[in-house]
UniProtKB/Swiss-Prot annotation:
Localization annotation: Vacuole membrane
Disulphide-bridged cysteine pairs: none
Descriptive protein name: Vacuolar membrane-associated protein iml1
Domain of life per record: Eukaryota
Keyword terms: Membrane, Phosphoprotein, Vacuole
Protein topology in the membrane: Peripheral membrane protein
Gene for this chain: iml1
GO molecular function, one term: GTPase activator activity
Species the sequence originates in: Schizosaccharomyces pombe (strain 972 / ATCC 24843) (Fission yeast)
Length: 1496
């Protein structure tokens, strides 16, 4: 029953709920009911006001209702707002189109199933959300009502917004989320890789007179960037140009010699093998692949300079690829045009996909927490048709199954008459038989009639019938769909949208070719009416039982042609084996004889690539039939006579057909043209673009009658089966990932059953025919099925996917039958138990975490119970249910309606792996059954290519080894043990998420830090370096606060010890090699150095003790460590640190229980003269500050000087090479040097989440304030958004102390090419060799490695670079230096710029390896633009990586500047401080005095 209530609006800050309702006004309602809320219509308003339903009341339009589940009004709100009936947020009222305090009609909805949403689309940006987080978010939404523009929250954050809801096949404003709803997640902050295929067709004109590459540069890309800008997306874009250059077998490869008349007369004899190493294609021809990075990780908002640069690169791309400089016999370099660009069909399509996917196989390394998703866009002038290598196809399919990367193909051509995208490869079974047939036919060809380098030859002695029989058995090519690819045709959709509606209406009634015809493109306007246009011949489908050449089929066709049954669907379209296929809007009254004459010229057009050849023996005039009866009389005898006539005249054709090797089609083979003519329905790259009348021209389909080809090259006789000439209505073109698309797959024939285990794809026997088969014939195509709400029409451009790429759906609707599981899969079973001592989760929570881990690895939840057959044969026993069946089970368990043992969840990785997780009835165990498909070995392929990186100025040869991830051997048992808590160590095989961060010293310090020292009246006494050291102490406090002790021995923690001491962090100003040397020397001289005791000392002193007693205790065995402390090459003898002294006071004196009390008492002792600061500069501070016992209380004699120089140490002849001697005799010292430690850390500091967000944090034990401090975070079970919030909190806190938190790559930059083939370092050399090192340079302990880079280091310091990571060779061989994550593995020393934008290494040849820090630059670029596309960066941060590189290159290439720099450094070498002040002018803002007095 509907009631009327007054609707109030409120802001989300007032009420936490989107809707609140006074349930007292609706007695039959209860919390949890769904209410339909709609605005009143005109009649209801009139009835309420006693008015007639006339006038303006009828003008009030009835809006779509909104479905909500309002929360009950609390008693407090009832008292404060007694008149409140129903209140919603303002956005819901805008959906209803009503204002505040207006009446609405409210009705309870009894049946929730009618309100269920089929799909709900959630958009998010500027954050990384894993697929496991997506599932958790959807579980929270399940059982609730959602509405458009609703902000959904997850763990306290707002990760996304609902922008689209589908219910009953239509969009709606609101709906109910049930377990059957399919969520779709789309990212507005993804990474895009845009590949532009620069094939031969890129420089071809379309019918509209526009070049293809102009469509890409002036059409598609500007539109794409404009959409991104309008949507406010924050994508990261890289654009790569690629092509394949083929070098012909026949004749010379160099066709142009512009600078050598002499060589031009002789003819070139230079072949590609003489100048470079080319790969060999499937046909045995040499080729090379080229890649050029034009844009590298640029923000999507900064697109105007990107397009300007791209146009320049496109203009010179062809010249850079095919023009070679080759030395002649005189040693002169001559430019030659070598080879030709292949067509799009023969391009390196799969190689591009593999190179893109290769870098994403390790996306768990250097995880960017501000972006989600990766999308690949391939812009091609072709139609999405590719010839590939079978082994490469197998490797690519495996790689795509193991990744969650989406891929879109943008075709600049027209929609073809076959399904795309599609790939084909040689049939390994029939290829041998085909080669034998080719040799037989070639042997019968007269050599005198064969034209060299031509595609024509004389007719063989084979009869027509024998040739047709050979065609019927032809299965040379096998076809399949690439996994996870979508295709959109830009020319037939977006160009239409740029025209006015009137122009579009007029074009619907105009002739529009559905295939590219060379004659039509080349003729003038006046020639269009009289010219003859030839199209290719027909060929039967060899895989079908019948043949269009049979009398029965021909007669049936003739009968249907004139009985109104000619209009057939695309299902009746047969494949064509001609190198091209055409379709034309031919009038209905054109009879068969006229069509035969047009086809009589077709093959000549295809082969020659020029104008139509007219020398066909007896020329036949065009015939026009005006009578249906005369057409019926054209029967078998006429066809036979015509075929014989054409066969007799074909010999006259061959002499007139000539094509040069440079103009030969890329689809045709190099050695023999026979296989090329049998390749199938494909078009030549020069005219590969086809169309299927996308504007809907109405006419009747005419199936042409096949005739004999009158031009037979080595292939003897080629027949083709033509596509429809005209269409009554445009056929339905489907996206490859839609369910209907999967139904087009034909089951494998018996000849291919032996390869069923080895191929992860399904064979398509006829791409022209849409066979109605079951969807489970191609389960791989269903992997992306649930990303689409309806059938995808390929003629509609998929802007949604290219602007906001969708994540891999969480659900999958395929599960193998019991027979398939037994025959094609291997089973692995293990059980995970719950031990309350280690596991703090119950069975359901453990099951949820196990599902999350599998979802994050690309698995999907099986939601098709009909296809899931259990092992016992009962379809219901293994019912995986829907995506939230498990979630619903958890809710039911809380309500007491669940038997735990009934839970069973199935997950799938494509159709290759299936996991079944089932709970036992006890509630402590989970059984895991893994089914791994029996496949052949993974295999590897080496790929050689030429690469032009963004940092280079030429192509450089490179290679990469492709290999699919061996996901079948992933150790899921160990991962499940980690989830249970039985294991804490993360091996590399687990592929856990990891990221490295560095703390860089900033030039300014926040004024907020001074507040800590204002009470001591020493705010102006701390230098910038001292504040940065305080920042490290603050970080140690943060780490210690969130530290997790798995043994729960928190009682053993010492509250009176500083966190830095407890974490073992030490400070030094010496380089690593010098620090190791000093430590070894100190250990040799004093073997009884104090070590931290495992036992807590007993408090034994009272605060009333006299100063002599306290001084004796300080200098005794139980006192703070007193040692010689080195700081900035100054040695402070017999000193102790302030933090250690405060800890000693708190642990020694009775009545002191906190560090604050100890600090206060210590300052009292300082004021009494017991000790003092080494430079008499600071009071007692709890940090890294140096203090010394006063001479009156010191046991050891104390020098009057506060310090002595580190360089003043005397070295005798026996100690001259002390460094090497100490290292070689280090048996007495430590054999293991620990550089970092790891702790388990709870990232959820605020504890908003119900569970512990455990991560592993690695931190440095040794820190030099002049270099970086490193933090490494690793996680497997934690939520990425929680970690991002933690890092943001750390960044805000540490910036107050002059430290900047920057993400940096884990691997050294010299090895970046091993992870990302499109990323290479830039090498910068010095134009002038540096002079010898000054004599007064600092003493070094590794002169072999350190001294040779001394000048390089000075140059880097001059440009504000600081030390990042030492090289592995820095550490002595006698010492085992280890990090908590492994041994040092950097080959070269690495530096980083103070801004964090650039990383540099120094190689063995004293060259600089330069690489921008893209992990940091991408975040800066995201924040550097407002919505108006104006830069908001601080002026100090505008120096980009490109500008830094330009200045650095200019400096290194300028001999005068280098010579001046060397002179300044040499002249200042007498005073080390002058060296640093002159060589580090830009490196530090601190004065020389500050640098010498820091922290002392």
């Amino acid at each position: 029953m509907a009631i009327t209530l007054n609707l109030w609006t409120h802001e989300s800050s007032l009420f936490p709920n989107d809707a609140v309702l006074n349930y007292d006004l609706v007695p039959s309602a209860k919390p949890g009911d769904i209410f339909e809320i709609r605005a009143q219509n005109g009649d209801e308003i009139a009835l309420q006001h006693n008015h007639s339903s006339t006038g303006k009341l009828h003008a009030k339009r009835e809006k779509e209702p909104v479905y909500l589940m309002p929360s009950p009004l609390t008693d407090d709100l009832k008292r404060r707002h007694p008149n409140l009936q129903l209140s919603v947020v303002s956005h819901i009222s805008s959906l209803l189109n009503i204002k505040n305090r207006e009446p609405v009609v409210v009705k309870i909805c009894e049946d929730k199933t009618n309100l269920e949403a089929e799909h709900v689309v959630i958009f998010f940006r500027d954050q990384f959300i894993s697929r496991s987080d997506m599932w958790k978010l959807f579980r929270e939404l399940c059982g609730k009502c959602v509405y458009l523009k609703q902000r959904v929250s997850f763990i306290g954050d707002v990760p996304g917004e609902i922008r689209c809801i589908w219910r009953k096949g239509k969009k709606c404003h609101s709906a109910y989320i049930s377990e059957r709803t399919k969520p779709i997640f789309r990212s507005e902050s993804a990474r895009f890789l845009i590949f532009i295929q620069m094939s031969e067709e890129m420089w071809h004109f379309e019918e509209d007179g526009e070049l293809n590459y102009n469509k890409a540069i002036d059409g598609f890309l500007p539109d794409l960037f404009s959409f991104w800008r309008d949507l406010g997306t924050h994508h990261l874009v890289s654009i790569i140009l690629f092509t394949r250059v083929e070098y012909s077998h026949h004749g010379p490869m160099c066709v142009w010699q512009p600078r050598s008349q002499k060589n031009s007369e002789k003819g070139s004899s230079i072949y590609p093998q003489n100048s470079f190493n080319a790969s060999i294609d499937n046909e045995g021809g040499p080729y090379e692949d080229f890649f050029k990075v034009v844009v590298d990780n640029v923000s999507s908002r900064d697109w105007q300079p990107v397009l300007a640069n791209l146009k320049l690169e496109l203009a010179k791309f062809r010249q850079d690829v095919i023009v070679r400089k080759i030395k002649d016999e005189n040693g002169r370099e001559i430019e030659y045009i070598c080879g030709r660009m292949t067509g799009s069909q023969e391009g390196n399509f799969l190689e591009v996909i593999n190179m893109a996917v290769f870098q994403f196989q390790s996306d768990y390394i250097d995880r960017d927490l501000s972006r989600t998703g990766t999308s690949i866009i391939i812009v091609t002038p072709g139609t999405g048709l590719y010839e590939v290598n079978e082994k490469m196809l197998h490797l690519t399919s495996k790689s795509l199954l193991n990744t969650v990367v989406g891929m879109d193909i943008v075709s600049l051509g027209k929609v073809p008459l076959f399904l795309t995208p599609i790939v084909r490869y040689k049939n390994p079974v029939k290829n041998k038989k085909r080669s034998q047939l080719t040799s037989r036919i070639s042997s019968s060809v007269s050599p005198s009639n064969v034209i060299p380098n031509s595609l024509t030859s004389s007719v063989s002695n084979f009869s027509v019938s024998s040739f047709l029989n050979n065609l019927k058995e032809d299965t040379e090519w096998l076809y399949t769909f690439p996994i996870g690819c979508n295709i959109s045709f830009y020319s037939t959709t977006e160009m239409r949208s740029l025209r006015s509606p009137w122009e579009n209406l007029m074009r619907e009634h105009q002739f529009e070719p559905t295939a590219k015809m060379h004659e039509l493109q080349m003729m003038g306007v006046l020639e269009a009416e009289s010219a003859k246009i030839s199209i290719p011949l027909l060929q039967s489908d060899p895989l079908l039982k019948g043949s269009v050449f049979s009398e029965e089929v021909q007669e049936d066709y003739d009968e249907r042609q004139f009985t109104g049954e000619a209009a057939v669907s695309a299902n009746d379209v047969l494949s064509s084996s001609s190198p091209r296929h055409f379709s034309s809007h031919t009038p209905v009254n054109v009879d068969k004889s006229s069509y035969l004459e047009m086809n009589g010229h077709s093959l000549s057009t295809v082969i020659s690539g020029k104008e139509s050849i007219s020398s066909f023996g007896a020329k036949v005039d065009d015939l026009k039939s005006t009578s249906k009866e005369s057409a019926r009389q054209f029967g078998k005898s006429a066809l036979t006579e015509r075929l014989q006539k054409l066969a007799g005249n074909s010999s006259n054709v061959s002499s007139s057909l000539q094509t040069s090797s440079s103009n030969k089609s890329s689809l045709l083979t190099k050695k023999s043209s026979f296989p090329a003519l049998l390749k199938g329905f494909l078009a030549l790259p020069a005219t590969v673009t086809t169309s299927a009348n996308p504007l809907g021209f109405k006419s009747t389909i005419q199936r042409p009658i096949p005739i004999k080809n009158n031009e037979d090259s080595d292939s003897c006789k080629a027949f083709s089966q033509a596509p429809p000439i005209a269409t009554k209505k445009p056929p339905t073109f489907l996206k490859p990932n839609s369910p209907e698309y999967a139904k087009t797959v034909i089951p494998k024939s018996s000849t291919n059953l032996e390869n069923e285990y080895q191929t992860p794809w399904k064979i398509i026997q006829n791409p022209f025919k849409l066979k109605e088969t079951t969807a489970d014939n191609d389960p791989v195509s269903l992997r992306w099925e649930h990303l689409y709400m309806k059938v995808q029409d390929v003629r509609k451009f998929n802007w949604l996917s290219m602007c906001t790429p969708g994540a891999l759906p969480l659900t999958f609707s395929y599960f193998p039958s019991e027979e398939e599981l037994n025959d094609k899969f291997e089973e692995y079973t293990y059980t995970i138990g719950i031990d309350p001592e280690f596991t703090q989760m119950n069975q359901q929570e453990l099951l949820a975490e196990m599902i999350c881990q599998r979802l994050s690895r690309g698995y999907q939840i099986v939601v098709n119970p009909a296809a899931a057959v259990s092992y016992s044969g009962n379809p219901k026993a293994n019912k995986a249910g829907t995506i939230t069946d498990f979630s619903r089970s958890v809710n039911n368990q809380r309500n007491g309606h669940l038997t735990v043992g009934s839970d069973a969840v199935c997950l799938s990785l494509g159709d290759s792996q299936f996991h079944r997780l089932s709970c036992d009835s006890v509630g402590y165990n989970i059984e895991v059954k893994r089914y791994v498909k029996k496949v052949s070995g993974q295999g590897k392929m080496r790929y050689d290519y030429n690469f032009w990186s963004k940092n280079e100025c030429k192509y450089v040869k490179s290679n990469i080894t492709f290999s699919a991830n061996d996901s079948a051997n992933y150790n899921w048992n160990y991962v499940d043990q980690l989830i249970c808590g039985f294991e804490t160590y993360l091996p590399d095989s687990v592929k856990y998420w990891r990221a490295r961060f560095v703390l860089l010293p900033m030039s300014t310090t926040s004024t907020h830090v001074f507040q800590k020292y204002q009470l001591l009246d020493h705010a102006d006494a701390l230098s910038d370096e001292e504040f940065r050291v305080e920042g490290i102490y603050k970080l140690s406090e943060l780490l210690y606060k969130g530290k997790i002790d798995p043994m729960n021995d928190s009682n053993n923690k010492t509250p009176n010890t500083s966190p830095a001491e407890l974490l073992g962090i030490k400070f030094t100003t010496l380089p690593m090699a010098q620090y190791i040397h000093s430590e070894l020397e100190a250990l040799r001289l004093d073997s009884s150095r104090n070590e931290q005791s495992l036992f807590m000392p007993n408090k034994r002193l009272d605060c009333s003790a006299d100063l002599h007693t306290i001084a004796k205790e300080i200098q005794g065995p139980g006192g703070p460590k007193i040692d010689d402390i080195t700081w900035h090459y100054r040695i402070y003898e017999n000193c102790f640190l302030g933090s250690e002294f405060v800890s000693w006071l708190a642990n020694t004196f009775i009545g002191i229980n906190t560090r604050e009390e100890a600090l206060k008492y210590g300052n009292k002792l300082l004021s009494l003269g017991l000790f003092d600061h080494a430079l008499k500069k600071h009071p007692l501070l709890d940090g890294y500050y140096v203090y010394r016992i006063s001479p009156d209380y010191s046991i050891k004699p104390v020098s009057n000087r506060p310090y002595r120089s580190w360089f003043s140490r005397k070295k005798d002849s026996g100690q001259k090479h002390l460094d090497n001697k100490i290292i070689t005799e280090s048996e007495a010292g430590p054999s293991r040097l620990e550089l970092s430690r790891r702790i388990l850390f709870n990232a959820d500091v605020e504890k908003k989440n119900g569970k512990s967000e455990t991560v592993t944090v690695h931190y440095d034990l040794l820190h030099n304030p002049a270099s970086c401090y490193h933090i490494r975070i690793e996680w497997l079970l934690a939520t990425a958004s929680v970690i991002e919030k933690l890092l943001q909190s750390w960044s805000r806190i540490l910036e107050r102390y002059g430290l900047k938190l920057v993400e940096a790559p884990i691997h050294e930059i010299a090895a970046v090419g091993e992870l990302n083939p499109f990323d290479q370092v830039s090498i910068i050399s010095l134009a002038l060799d540096p002079p010898p090192i000054p004599e007064r340079a600092p003493l070094v302990n590794d002169p072999v490695n350190y001294s040779k880079n001394w000048w390089n280091v000075k140059i880097l310091e001059h440009f504000d670079f600081i030390l990042d990571t030492e090289a592995a060779s820095t550490f002595p061989k006698s010492i085992t230096a280890v990090y908590s994550w492994g041994k040092p593995n950097f080959r070269y020393v690495q530096y980083i710029h103070r801004t964090g934008t650039v990383l540099v290494q120094i190689d063995d040849d004293q060259r600089f390896l330069w690489l921008p820090n893209r992990l940091h630059n991408s975040k800066v670029s995201k924040l550097s633009f407002t919505k108006s596309n104006k830069s908001t960066l601080n002026p100090n941060l505008k120096e980009t990586a490109e500008e830094l590189e330009r200045k650095f290159r200019e400096f290194c290439s300028n001999k005068d500047e280098l010579d001046q720099f060397y002179g300044i450094v040499n002249h200042a070498s007498d005073d080390r401080r002058s060296i640093y002040s002159s060589a580090s002018t830009h490196a530090s803002n601190a004065s020389a005095d500050d640098a010498s007095n820091v922290n002392v």
